[in-house]
């Protein structure tokens, strides 16, 4: 045995030290030297030629046509000097003041018209017109319309005075205009009662009549406007009510559809769950079928242990892998062993999972035995 060990060690050393030029056993020092030689022995002429080419290209790039480059630089500078600078444009252009001037002209025209109306304020009727125009809501008074109708007579100075009093009551604050109207009415009692007062009264009556007409027209317009607004309000209210009804109906219908959709979804979900339950039941049946032992195997094992079987579980038919075990049912506990049948037994599949451990124990034991034998022989 000692000779065998020496032979094995010597053979291993010989294989490692034997220099073979085939395969992977190559002299490492020789390979390193070859690599160094191939790395150091570089062609110096090729490197020198490359350096010469590089220096020549650099000199050519730097020294070629310096005059042309200077001329190009001068041309660029001259172009920069000659190019005129663009004036900055004001992008914020203001609109022409034509509309403002027109607005001022319109305002001036209105002021001029008002000044002419002020000059005519001595007539007495202009005061009533101005008061009625200022107080648009007062234009619907029936008393003023009657005063204007009375002013159409022309000869009745007292009616004109009453119209002036009505104008005074409408204006309230214009006492001066009322005084002028009273003076005009009093002038009818003097020497001008025949000519100037009658002409003034006629003019006032004419002014009063259009005022009455204007007044009535304004009242009618106001009534029509109010009626139109009321009608529009009624139509709007009716439209809103109809829209509300339609909206409510639409919401109710949407709610019904939603409820129906939810009910259908619930039914489908319930059906799906029922189907899942069926699938689970089928899977359970399949598992039970997989767990059910073979009838032939049960019968054979019953014939072996018929005399010893009881209400306790019998040992498994195998020591490694899947097998069968059985016991008597409670109803067949008092039966004789010869009368037992497969229907009198409860059977199930048994599995033995410790097979690997057994094999490990066996292999380890065999290894120990071999080692002991070797030790004894040595």
From Swiss-Prot:
Task: Keywords in alphabetical order, please.
Answer: Cell membrane, Cytoplasm, Disulfide bond, Glycoprotein, GPI-anchor, Lipoprotein, Malaria, Membrane, Repeat, Signal, Sporozoite
Instruction: Kindly list every residue the record annotates as glycosylated.
Output: 319
Instruction: List localization entries.
Output: Cell membrane; Cytoplasm
Q: Where is this region: 18 X 6 AA tandem repeats of D-G-A-R-A-[EA]?
A: 99-206
Extent of Gly residues compositional bias: 214-283
Compositionally biased, Basic and acidic residues: which spans? 66-92, 101-126, 141-162
Q: Where is the composition biased (Low complexity)?
A: 127-140, 163-200
Location of the region described as 6 X 11 AA tandem repeats of G-N-[QR]-[AE]-G-G-Q-A-G-A-G in the Swiss-Prot/TrEMBL record: 212-277
What ranges does the record give for the region Disordered, renumbered to this chain?
Answer: 50-291
Q: Which is one Pfam family of this protein?
A: TSP_1
Disulfide topology? 316-350, 320-355
Gene Ontology cellular component terms for the protein in this record: cell surface; cytoplasm; plasma membrane; side of membrane
As for membrane topology, the entry says: Lipid-anchor; GPI-anchor
Q: How is it modified after translation?
A: During host cell invasion, proteolytically cleaved at the cell membrane in the region I by a papain-like cysteine protease of parasite origin. Cleavage is triggered by the sporozoite contact with highly sulfated heparan sulfate proteoglycans (HSPGs) present on the host hepatocyte cell surface. Cleavage exposes the TSP type-1 (TSR) domain and is required for productive invasion of host hepatocytes but not for adhesion to the host cell membrane. Cleavage is dispensable for sporozoite development in the oocyst, motility and for traversal of host and vector cells. O-glycosylated; maybe by POFUT2.
Q: Where is the lipid attached (GPI-anchor amidated cysteine)?
A: 355
Where are the stretches annotated Region I?
A: 91-95
Task performed by this protein: Essential sporozoite protein. In the mosquito vector, required for sporozoite development in the oocyst, migration through the vector hemolymph and entry into the vector salivary glands. In the vertebrate host, required for sporozoite migration through the host dermis and infection of host hepatocytes. Binds to highly sulfated heparan sulfate proteoglycans (HSPGs) on the surface of host hepatocytes.
Name of the protein in its database record = Circumsporozoite protein
- Naturally occurring in which organism (per UniProt): Plasmodium cynomolgi (strain London)
Highest lineage ranks of the organism?
Eukaryota, Sar, Alveolata, Apicomplexa, Aconoidasida
